């Protein structure tokens, strides 16, 4: 906790180039709004308070971030970054320091920001700059005798100033008492007719406040999002960072460029992940887990030694040790699979508990079911759990064998060791240890002829 650090996040921009009705800062990167990434960074820095200045989209921004401990200030009309900061000044403690961040710059690291806050703590002006080979569009850092003298916006810069490659990122930290004074002195006599926050640099120089510059470890940390193309670019940068961390932790990625983690992914030892897999929410993979190609996992815990074949979808479920799932399996919310459970191709399981050693290998639907150990479910089996108004549970006890093409009309219980013959429609409980079946008597109609379609003339 940094008891005197206030973080101000500017998030009022419309984002015209996004071509969207959604406020720019609410567009998602890695499964989280852009603003959410910045808020998480602020929280990691231990700020005493975090204030978000919002504008376009009205209350959509505060509503989207309602779970975070934030204060919000509306910038009803956008007249530049200096004007945005002015709206929030009453929220900032005079005896603290203020770090200014941007809601559309989501990849900034805490290790980059910490030195800026430390500079402000020491009474200095902490300024984040970066050197770019092609600095078009950015404000230039003008130095005199190696010291920062001012920042000139691109549209206001002379030819000589446009040749400067050190540019302003907009991210800064200053003692709040200075910030409040300088903001009151800003003028809008520039090409844009706006109040530039960057103009406080010249005021700091005038007042003899030392400007201490720092640069990020990676240039992409300060990249902003103004278009869908830039959003896609930052998504790939972020996913590459995630992939590199996983590789460093010993995870085998068949292709690091074809991985999407949209939340948190925690892996044990010797985990292997094939291409085009998506991980959403919180996903935990135990030792030796193998994930086949094109799987989607959302809020899932998978125990050691389990293998998922291609195109398996698991959502809000727990998978036990040494399981085998897929290909083309769907595990829906509320499902718990115990050890050594096999779920095969085109099987869907919802809100069910499947105990150890049971197998559902082909073309089946199991919903709202409690299944014991060592159960074998034949191909084409359906638990009919919904009567049009209510859902009912099916109970299948240990060591049951269910023949293919069987329907179990819930509520119904199949006793321990029972066998259901193929094609059975079970509407009453099946007793333990017995064969239960229901089917029409087979008959052969002698002399029956299949209808023949008449041949077309010509």
UniProtKB/Swiss-Prot annotation:
Cited InterPro entries: Bifunctional_GlmU, GlmU-like, GlmU_C_LbH, Hexapep, MobA-like_NTP_Trfase, Nucleotide-diphossugar_trans, Trimer_LpxA-like_sf
Keyword Magnesium: yes
Residues binding UDP-N-acetyl-alpha-D-glucosamine: 10-13, 24, 75, 80-81, 102-104, 139, 153, 168, 226, 332, 350, 365, 376
Region (N-acetyltransferase): 250-458
Known EC number: 2.7.7.23, 2.3.1.157
Keyword list, A-Z: Acyltransferase, Cell shape, Cell wall biogenesis/degradation, Cytoplasm, Magnesium, Metal-binding, Multifunctional enzyme, Nucleotidyltransferase, Peptidoglycan synthesis, Repeat, Transferase
Pfam families: Hexapep, NTP_transf_3
Region annotation Linker: where it falls in the sequence: 229-249
Top enzyme class: transferase
Annotated cofactor note: Binds 1 Mg(2+) ion per subunit.
GO molecular function terms noted in the UniProt entry: glucosamine-1-phosphate N-acetyltransferase activity; magnesium ion binding; UDP-N-acetylglucosamine diphosphorylase activity
Single GO BP term: UDP-N-acetylglucosamine biosynthetic process
Superkingdom per UniProt: Bacteria
Subcellular location: Cytoplasm
Active site positions, chain numbering: 362
GO cellular component: cytoplasm; membrane
Names of required cofactors: Mg(2+)
Catalytic activity of the protein: alpha-D-glucosamine 1-phosphate + acetyl-CoA = N-acetyl-alpha-D-glucosamine 1-phosphate + CoA + H(+); N-acetyl-alpha-D-glucosamine 1-phosphate + UTP + H(+) = UDP-N-acetyl-alpha-D-glucosamine + diphosphate
Binding site for acetyl-CoA: 379, 385-386, 404, 422, 439
Pathway given in the UniProt record: Nucleotide-sugar biosynthesis; UDP-N-acetyl-alpha-D-glucosamine biosynthesis; N-acetyl-alpha-D-glucosamine 1-phosphate from alpha-D-glucosamine 6-phosphate (route II): step 2/2; Nucleotide-sugar biosynthesis; UDP-N-acetyl-alpha-D-glucosamine biosynthesis; UDP-N-acetyl-alpha-D-glucosamine from N-acetyl-alpha-D-glucosamine 1-phosphate: step 1/1; Bacterial outer membrane biogenesis; LPS lipid A biosynthesis
Subunit structure: Homotrimer.
NCBIfam families documented for this protein: glmU
Known function: Catalyzes the last two sequential reactions in the de novo biosynthetic pathway for UDP-N-acetylglucosamine (UDP-GlcNAc). The C-terminal domain catalyzes the transfer of acetyl group from acetyl coenzyme A to glucosamine-1-phosphate (GlcN-1-P) to produce N-acetylglucosamine-1-phosphate (GlcNAc-1-P), which is converted into UDP-GlcNAc by the transfer of uridine 5-monophosphate (from uridine 5-triphosphate), a reaction catalyzed by the N-terminal domain.
HAMAP family to which the protein is assigned, alphabetical: GlmU
Family according to the record: In the N-terminal section; belongs to the N-acetylglucosamine-1-phosphate uridyltransferase family.
Protein name in the entry: Bifunctional protein GlmU
Organism of derivation: Thiobacillus denitrificans (strain ATCC 25259 / T1)
Taxonomy of the source species: Bacteria, Pseudomonadati, Pseudomonadota, Betaproteobacteria, Nitrosomonadales
Gene behind this protein: glmU
């Amino acid at each position: 906790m940094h008891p005197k650090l206030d973080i101000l996040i500017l998030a009022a921009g419309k984002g015209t180039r996004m071509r969207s009705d959604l406020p720019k800062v609410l567009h998602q990167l890695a499964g989280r709004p852009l603003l959410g990434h910045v808020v998480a960074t602020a929280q990691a820095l231990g700020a005493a308070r975090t204030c978000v200045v919002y504008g376009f989209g009205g209350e959509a921004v505060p509503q989207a971030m309602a779970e975070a401990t934030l204060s919000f200030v509306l910038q009803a009309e956008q007249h530049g970054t200096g004007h945005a900061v002015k709206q929030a000044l009453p929220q900032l403690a005079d005896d603290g320091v203020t770090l200014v961040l941007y809601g559309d710059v989501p990849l900034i690291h805490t290790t980059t920001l910490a030195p800026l806050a430390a500079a402000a703590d020491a009474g200095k002006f902490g300024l984040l700059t970066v050197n770019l080979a092609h600095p078009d569009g950015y404000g230039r850092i003008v130095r005199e005798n190696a010291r920062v003298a001012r920042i000139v916006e691109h549209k206001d810069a002379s030819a000589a100033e446009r040749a400067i490659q050190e540019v302003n990122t907009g991210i800064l930290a200053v003692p709040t008492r200075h910030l409040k004074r300088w903001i009151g002195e800003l003028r809008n006599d520039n090409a844009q007719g706006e109040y530039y926050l960057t103009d406080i640099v010249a005021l700091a120089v005038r007042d003899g406040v030392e400007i201490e510059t720092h640069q990020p470890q990676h240039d992409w940390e300060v990249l902003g999002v103004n278009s869908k193309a830039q959003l896609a670019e930052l998504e790939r940068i972020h996913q590459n960072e995630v992939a590199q961390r996983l590789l460093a932790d010993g995870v085998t990625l068949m292709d690091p460029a074809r991985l999407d983690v949209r939340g948190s992914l925690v892996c044990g030892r010797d985990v292997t992940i094939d291409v085009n897999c998506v991980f959403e929410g919180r996903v935990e993979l135990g030792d030796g887990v193998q994930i086949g190609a094109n799987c989607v996992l959302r809020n899932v815990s998978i125990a050691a030694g389990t293998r998922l074949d291609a195109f398996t979808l698991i959502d809000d479920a727990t998978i036990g040790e040494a399981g085998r799932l897929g290909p083309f399996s769907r595990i829906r919310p509320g499902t718990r699979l115990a050890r050594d459970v096999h779920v095969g191709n085109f099987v869907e399981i919802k809100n069910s508990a499947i105990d150890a050693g049971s197998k559902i290998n082909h073309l089946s639907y199991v919903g709202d079911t409690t299944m014991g150990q060592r159960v074998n479910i034949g191909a084409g089996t359906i638990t009919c759990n919904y009567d049009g108004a209510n859902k009912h549970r099916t109970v299948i006890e240990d060591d049951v064998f269910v023949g293919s093409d069987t329907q179990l009309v819930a509520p119904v219980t199949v006793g321990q060791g029972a066998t259901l013959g193929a094609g059975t429609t079970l509407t009453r409980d099946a007793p333990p240890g017995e064969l239960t079946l229901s089917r029409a008597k087979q008959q052969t109609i002698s002399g029956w002829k299949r209808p023949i379609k008449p041949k077309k003339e010509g």
